[in-house]
């Protein structure tokens, strides 16, 4: 049998090419990672911070406008315009129908949104509400009991305004300025119409997503946020028996009920300082 012909061998790689390839493989892990595009960056940010939509902003602007107009509409004050002095006729305008009331309400309306908190345990626009969120209420209760809570957020910043609420106020300033004439038109001519429908559905969100306007929060038993941050407290039987008692007695009763004062709360947490560590240590 004739021996099989040996396969033709190709050109051997040159040594300098092998060296270059080795260097590339070594340097590859050290190369910087490609930067995320705007869409990718926003997608990652949504896992932690989700800024309010225009629908959410308009919804709570309307809520606070209604509340402010209701609060200022109970007075019977009459504003003296200064006219009619020469003809000795009484001159004045009811505060409830005055320009002054409209100006005072619209100039302070956005500051009211800073009373809101972010409730991440809720969905949709209901995540914005007054009062402490369920999550932080639980954490505060743990601190009251002397439990050491480990979080990335320092204890002093627990009650600070969140990025979402700060943006809610910022967008409110822009919205009120942009739709100032619409609010004024409602105030003068259309107060019989619902302000949320008139301002948001008919103007601000016309042709846009307005689904959040229909979202409502029924609230849970004992949920302070559903009551605007106010939680009614019933007197205990011992407190009633004492008829109110002295401040010292009330303080002792408060200690027995396990409801520490703000000073005690801060003292407890200072005794158990928070340390920065990964979230999974909570």
Swiss-Prot record:
Top-rank lineage group of the source organism = Eukaryota
The intrachain disulfides are 55-212, 58-200, 110-172
Q: Which GO terms describe its molecular function?
A: signaling receptor binding
* Sites carrying sugar chains: 159
What residue stretches are annotated with the Saposin B-type domain?
Answer: 53-275
Q: Which InterPro entries does the UniProt record give?
A: DUF3456 (IPR021852)
Coiled-coil positions are 159-185
Region Disordered: which residues?
A: 221-282
Its chief place of residence is endoplasmic reticulum
One biological process GO term for this chain?
A: innate immune response
Q: Where in the cell is it found?
A: Endoplasmic reticulum
Q: Per UniProt, which keywords does this protein have?
A: Chaperone, Coiled coil, Disulfide bond, Endoplasmic reticulum, Glycoprotein, Immunity, Innate immunity, Signal
Q: Which GO terms describe its cellular component?
A: endoplasmic reticulum
Give one Pfam family, short name only: DUF3456
Q: Where is the composition biased (Acidic residues)?
A: 255-266
Protein's job? Toll-like receptor (TLR)-specific co-chaperone for HSP90B1. Required for proper TLR folding, except that of TLR3, and hence controls TLR exit from the endoplasmic reticulum. Consequently, required for both innate and adaptive immune responses.
The text of the family note is: Belongs to the canopy family.
- Provide the assembly information: Interacts with HSP90B1; this interaction is disrupted in the presence of ATP. Interacts with TLR1, TLR2, TLR4 and TLR9.
What protein does this entry describe? Protein canopy homolog 3
Q: Which organism is it from?
A: Bos taurus (Bovine)
């Amino acid at each position: 049998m004739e021996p099989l012909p040996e396969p033709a061998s190709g050109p051997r790689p040159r040594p300098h090419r092998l060296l270059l390839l080795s260097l590339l493989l070594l340097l590859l892990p050290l190369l910087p990672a490609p930067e995320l595009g705007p869409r990718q960056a926003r997608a990652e940010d949504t896992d932690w911070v989700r800024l309010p939509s225009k629908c959410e902003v308009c919804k709570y602007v309307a809520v606070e406008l209604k509340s402010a107009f209701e609060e200022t509409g109970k007075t019977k004050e009459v504003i003296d315009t200064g006219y009619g002095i020469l003809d000795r006729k009484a001159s004045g305008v009811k505060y409830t129908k005055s320009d002054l009331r409209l100006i005072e309400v619209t100039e302070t309306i956005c500051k009211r949104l800073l009373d809101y908190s972010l409730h991440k345990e809720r969905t949709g626009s209901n995540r914005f509400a007054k009062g402490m969120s369920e999550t932080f209420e639980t954490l505060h209760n743990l601190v009251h009991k002397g439990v050491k809570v480990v979080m990335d957020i320092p204890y002093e910043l627990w009650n600070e305004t969140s990025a979402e609420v700060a943006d809610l106020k910022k967008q409110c300033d822009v919205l009120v300025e942009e739709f100032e004439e619409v609010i004024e038109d409602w105030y003068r001519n259309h107060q019989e119409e619902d302000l949320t429908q008139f301002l948001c559905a008919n103007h601000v969100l016309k042709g846009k997503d307005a689904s959040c306007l229909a979202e409502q929060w029924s609230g849970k038993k004992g949920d302070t946020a559903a009551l605007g941050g106010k939680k009614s407290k019933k007197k205990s039987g011992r407190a009633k028996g004492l008829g109110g008692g002295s401040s010292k007695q009330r303080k002792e009763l408060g200690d027995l009920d396990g409801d520490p004062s703000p000073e005690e709360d801060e003292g407890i947490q200072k005794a158990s300082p928070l340390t920065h560590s990964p979230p999974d240590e909570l």
